[in-house]
């Protein structure tokens, strides 16, 4: 299947199976869908989008034993404080957040785990924020996407009275982003020297700007490509790169170097 076929399949699966899987009386689960797609298609890569802790079953994690499942998770946790999660009307608590992250580490070791976290939700006290911060600091993950809370018209939280001051929201966001940057740097440095299967993200005439994406969601810039290298040779399918350095001027990027022997194959 080419990329277009993959997008069509994804769209059709979503439209046809969404109601069947998420209906209250449904006997079907996300795990059923993934297992069926893995069994009945030959698509080489599958990556799940945003997922909540309550959806992360052991059965789902065991599907990652299949090499076609990309070891990358985007966790929509929002907070790691049970009181704050209750205020957000989430169907899980901090214990389940903790369990889900530990389960990923246990069953899909070395996976890239990104998370969405909101700071300054109405009613979030300093103690609540510190609980989230300390809990996350002790858990396994790769990166946090931090969002200061803002009112959205028509939502229940818009009516809440205990709003957090804008300056305080920015302070909390800054602290979490610093924690995230430190963790991302540690994880990135641990990748140096490893070989990764990648796909091409962009094609530039300037060979110093070529971006690739690994199965475990590390975005890298290829370096030392010859000026006469034809990118069409790697435009379809996967190829290997060797991670050689981490550019600390941009914490979201790593530098990779193609393995010459694989490029020539």
Where are these regions (language model features)?
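Glycine-rich, charged/polar anion/phosphate-binding loops
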Residues: 33, 59-60, 130-134, 182-185, ...
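Structural beta-strand/beta-sheet cores of well-ordered domains, especially the beta-sheet scaffolds
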Residues: 44-49, 71, 111, 142-145, ...
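Generic beta-strand/beta-sheet core signal
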Residues: 49-51, 76-78, 116-118, 147-149, ...
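Thr-Gly-centered strand-to-loop micro-motif
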Residues: 51, 144, 223-225
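Short, charged low-complexity intrinsically disordered segments located at boundaries
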Residues: 63-69, 91-94, 132-133, 201-213
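A structural motif corresponding to the C-terminal lobe/cap of the Radical SAM core domain
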Residues: 71, 83-199
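Terminal RNA-binding accessory module
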Residues: 159-265
